[in-house]
């Protein structure tokens, strides 16, 4: 009972933002010193209601792919899916299907919240058979898609500039720490979309043993400063240059996008 209460207390305060019919479109771009900022990919995040094994669920799918003009360089077609219990608002399943050039990878996580465990299964292109592992959960353990929605659940009234929070990101056979820090409010211009009031966060990913940060694991997120709390812009450095993802379209939002200034 205590663990269930703890789980409920840790649930996203704005978890009602699992909004059926919501569609968020993003464009991904790359830029470097001698390489202009160029759009190379797209991502669509959708939320629908469905029944799974007789239970009401939200199905959230994030589907990213390379734009046609760049598929000859690297043909990316990645899909991530979560099923969320509509009553308890806890993720029940996570699946990934990653196709990047000749690389293939598949994974599946099944959450057992009463036992506070997660059963993971994964297989790569060169693996003869899939691999499995069972790991312990805490109320702060989440897969990457669930983390995306957790950031949307933050209550802006409780934010303190410089304050750090730590979550746990599940990755097949390990759990990595995700540390995020509120940097303050900022007006952000988004290409072809306009200017928005945003909440700015710095995020870092470490190992399960601690914060052993390497190049590319630190990134910045700008979230709309309104009731929708949409990630509007993400920027991450890479070895040469940086990659960005920014909102390019939306519909089916639960609330007006009041953060848009012009």
What are these regions (language model features)?
Residues 1-7:
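Short, small-residue-biased leader/transition segments that mark boundaries at the very start
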Residues 4, 88, 115-117:
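Structural motif
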Residues 8-111, 156-262:
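Acidic, serine/threonine-rich low-complexity disordered tracts
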Residues 113-171:
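Active-site/ligand-binding surface loops and adjacent short beta/alpha elements
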